[in-house]
Amino acid sequence: MIKVVVDTGITVSAAFRDRTPEEVILFIVEQEEFEWIISPAVLEEYTEVLARKKFNLSPEILQKWREMFEHFTTMIEPDIEIDFPRDQKDAKLLECALAGEADYLITGDKDFTEARKLVQTTIISVSQFKQLIVDKWS
């Protein structure tokens, strides 16, 4: 099983039907060999950010994403805390990746460059993941 953590920014981009993020997320949920890992803190961030007024997502789209999180993710309870001074709010994603023994953390956030020495997880952009994994797998 290939375990993946997806940064909130990638999820938001996919909700707006941005082609590459949406394609990558659909690939992850459709392939039995892949597991999308989240924690309660990550789920809370996903739902809070997607519901922000500035994004103006319809109730139907928000419901679609809530259902996707419910049915196509694996919830874990990280029992570790990571001090990530670069951006402490991103620590929850690193904790999820570490506790869930994720193979990949997909992000567009440059702050995670410094995190490479904190986790064994491969930190990769959505376009790199598409090129290295999705395009070769399909």
Map each language-model feature to its residues:
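PIN/NYN-family metal-dependent endoribonuclease catalytic core
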Residues: 6, 21-51
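Alpha-helix capping/helix-boundary segments
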Residues: 10-11, 42, 111-112
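Residues at secondary-structure transition points
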Residues: 20, 37, 60, 84, ...
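Membrane interface segments of multi-pass transport proteins and intramembrane proteases
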Residues: 55-58
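Active-site neighborhoods of divalent-metal-dependent phosphate/nucleic-acid chemistry enzymes
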Residues: 71-104
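Acidic, PIN/NYN-like endoribonuclease modules and their adjacent C-terminal/linker elements
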Residues: 100, 110-138
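Metal-dependent nucleic-acid phosphoesterase active-site entry motif
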Residues: 1-19
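A secondary-structure boundary/capping signal
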Residues: 6-8, 38-39, 108-109, 125
